[in-house]
């Protein structure tokens, strides 16, 4: 155990020495560069104005403003190259100064590799230019080419479809629902007819590949929403002509078990009241009188 701890301390000391050496080499490399990074420039600043501002500190070989590849607008930073490192060092005096209404930041541009071959220059953070190296920006890389949150390489990958978070269709649409083509248990959360399409008509709660499979929610028929065997009824819950129930909780008849419906569909008047409710007729009135 003691031996392992000694080896660990030795590795940590070696790592610290390597880090210090690399930092020192990086500083030397920065100070020996004739290219500087200029950040925070105004969007109205062009390369001619940039060259004019830095030419008072030495001969400017190149002044390049980095622009967006799609819109062509300035990304707010640039690189200026001088003929010598001394001139680049003199240009550091513009750090924190105002240029065309904006306070700019000036630093040495560091040369770095890209990881895919090719080399470029970077500012205080990030890299510009993807696989070919390119230039470094203060706020990270360019970020294009790999699709957005809901692009072709979306958050859910191919399972989410070729677009948004939930695929090409709606939450319970025909093609790809919340989980896309390979969902949780079927083709879509809501199946082929929407999340709850035609609750009393064709296509029950989870018809054609719902959450639990390919049957209805209550294992009933598709015309009465799966309640055939649940309330001892042989008729649909919702009649298409009068919107009244033809069968109720007690079997083939209505709530009170009589021959008449509680709410008759033809005249809209109730012939029998609810269970336990006594209707008054002319005989009762005469008896009370």
Curated annotation (Swiss-Prot):
Residues 257-272 have a biased composition (Polar residues). Gene3D superfamilies: 3.30.70.330. Residues 219-289 are annotated as: Disordered. Belongs to the GR-RBP family. This is Glycine-rich RNA-binding protein 5, mitochondrial. It comes from the Eukaryota. Residues 34-111 form the RRM domain. It comes from Arabidopsis thaliana. The lineage of its organism: Eukaryota, Viridiplantae, Streptophyta, Embryophyta, Tracheophyta. It is found in: Mitochondrion. Keywords: Mitochondrion, mRNA processing, RNA-binding, Transit peptide. InterPro entries: Nucleotide-bd_a/b_plait_sf (IPR012677), RBD_domain_sf (IPR035979), RRM2_NsCP33-like (IPR048289), RRM_dom (IPR000504), SLIRP/GR-RBP-like (IPR052462). GO terms for molecular function: ATP binding; copper ion binding; mRNA binding; protein homodimerization activity; RNA binding; single-stranded DNA binding.
């Amino acid at each position: 155990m003691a031996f392992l701890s000694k080896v660990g301390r030795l590795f940590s000391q070696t790592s610290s020495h390597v880090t210090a050496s690399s930092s020192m080499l990086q500083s030397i490399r920065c100070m020996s560069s004739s290219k500087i990074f200029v950040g925070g420039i105004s969007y109205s600043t062009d390369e001619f104005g940039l060259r004019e501002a830095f030419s008072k500190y030495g001969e400017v070989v190149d002044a390049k403003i980095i622009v967006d590849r799609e819109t062509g607008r300035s990304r707010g930073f640039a690189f200026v190259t001088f003929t010598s490192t001394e001139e680049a060092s003199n240009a550091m005096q513009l750090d924190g100064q105002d240029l065309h209404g904006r306070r700019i930041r000036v630093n040495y541009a560091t040369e770095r590799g890209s990881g895919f071959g090719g080399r470029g220059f970077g500012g205080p953070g990030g890299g510009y230019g993807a696989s070919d190296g390119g230039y470094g920006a203060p706020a990270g890389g360019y970020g294009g080419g790999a699709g957005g949150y809901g692009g072709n390489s979306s958050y859910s990958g191919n399972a989410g479809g070729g677009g948004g978070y939930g695929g090409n269709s709606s939450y319970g649409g025909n093609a790809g629902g919340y989980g896309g083509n390979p969902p949780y248990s079927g083709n879509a959360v809501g199946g082929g007819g929407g999340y709850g399409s035609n609750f009393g008509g064709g296509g029950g709660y989870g018809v054609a590949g719902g959450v639990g499979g390919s049957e209805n929610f209550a294992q009933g028929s598709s015309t009465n929403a799966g309640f055939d065997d649940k309330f001892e009824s042989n008729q649909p819950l919702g009649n298409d002509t009068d919107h009244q129930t033809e069968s109720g909780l007690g079997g083939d008849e209505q709530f009170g078990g009589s021959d008449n419906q509680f709410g008759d569909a033809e005249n809209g008047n109730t012939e029998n009241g609810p269970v336990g409710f006594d209707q008054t007729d002319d005989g009762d009135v005469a008896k009370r009188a």
